[in-house]
Structures are given as structure tokens and as C-alpha cells.
UniProtKB/Swiss-Prot annotation:
Heterotetramer of two alpha chains and two beta chains. This is Hemoglobin subunit alpha-A. Transmembrane segments: none annotated. Residues 2-143 form the Globin domain. GO terms for molecular function: haptoglobin binding; heme binding; metal ion binding; organic acid binding; oxygen binding; oxygen carrier activity; peroxidase activity. It comes from Seriola quinqueradiata (Five-ray yellowtail). Heme b binds at residue 89. Red blood cells. One of its GO terms (cellular component) is haptoglobin-hemoglobin complex. Belongs to the globin family. O2 binds at residue 60. Involved in oxygen transport from gills to the various peripheral tissues. Keywords: Heme, Iron, Metal-binding, Oxygen transport, Transport.
């Protein structure tokens, strides 16, 4: 599913609104993923605590959302812009690419909770398309 010019504009504008809360959104989204999809905890077995309130989950959630913000800036070439991150996840971290979609779903959920009025159906569809394209770009090096 490709991103239209309108989708890109909507995503950029909404990112400007949500970016001040992005670290919190990322922490909660990652914490939810680790709780609801416990098989994802295997990637973080080196952490002392993978609970949703742990400092490591909060820190990595913020790191994830910083990368999402970086991807917003590279929205016209997600595959090229995220090549190094894709390579890291494919060859070093060996993350199952299905987990990118799971995390994207959780980011959508938490974003809707943080912005119940602003996260309109139009914004929802554009952000969802963006996150799905981001997940595909991250999975690119797995081929």
C-alpha cells in the first residue's frame, strides 16, 4: 500500500503534534507488545526486567519512537532511509519481521489513547499506512 501525497502530509503534521509525547507512546506501545505478545520477550532476554514499567522498556520505547520520527523525515524513501536499521534487525538482532507489524499496531492503539479527539479516522488510516510501510522497509533486508 503506497502513501499518497496527502497521507505523507497528514503523517508529517500529526507527527509534529505527537512528537512531544512520542517517548511515552513508544514506552507504552512496547510494554503492551511485550505483555500481550509474550513471545516478543525473547529478544530482550538480556534485560533484568521486561515489565511494561521497567526503565529499559521505557528507554527502548523512546528509542523506537525516535527512529519513527527519523522515518517521518525519510517518508519519501523509507527503504533507502531505513536500510541500516533493517540490516541491524535482520542480521545482528535477528528480529522476526512480523514483530514490526505487531509493534505498529500497538503504536496505533496507544496513539489513539493519547489523542482521542485528534486521532481522526483520516489520520488513523494515514498513520497506519505509514507504519505498515515502515514495517515493510524494515523487513527489506530479510529477502
Amino acid at each position: 500500500m503506497s502513501l499518497s501525497g496527502k497521507d505523507k502530509s497528514v503523517v508529517k503534521a500529526f507527527w509534529d503534534k505527537m512528537s512531544p509525547k512520542s517517548a511515552e507512546i513508544g514506552a507504552e506501545a512496547l510494554g503492551r507488545m511485550l505483555t500481550v505478545y509474550p513471545q516478543t520477550k525473547t529478544y530482550f532476554s538480556h534485560w533484568a526486567d521486561v515489565g511494561p514499567d521497567s526503565a529499559q522498556v521505557k528507554k527502548h520505547g523512546a528509542t523506537i519512537m525516535a527512529a519513527v520520527g527519523d522515518a517521518v523525515g525519510k517518508i519519501d524513501d523509507l527503504v533507502g532511509g531505513l536500510s541500516a536499521l533493517s540490516e541491524l534487525h535482520a542480521f545482528k538482532l535477528r528480529v522476526d519481521p512480523a514483530n514490526f507489524r505487531i509493534l505498529a499496531h500497538n503504536i496505533i492503539l496507544v496513539t489513539a489513547m493519547y489523542f482521542p479527539t485528534d486521532f481522526t479516522p483520516e489520520i488513523h488510516v494515514s498513520v497506519d499506512k505509514f507504519l505498515q510501510n515502515l514495517a515493510l522497509a524494515l523487513a527489506e533486508r530479510y529477502r
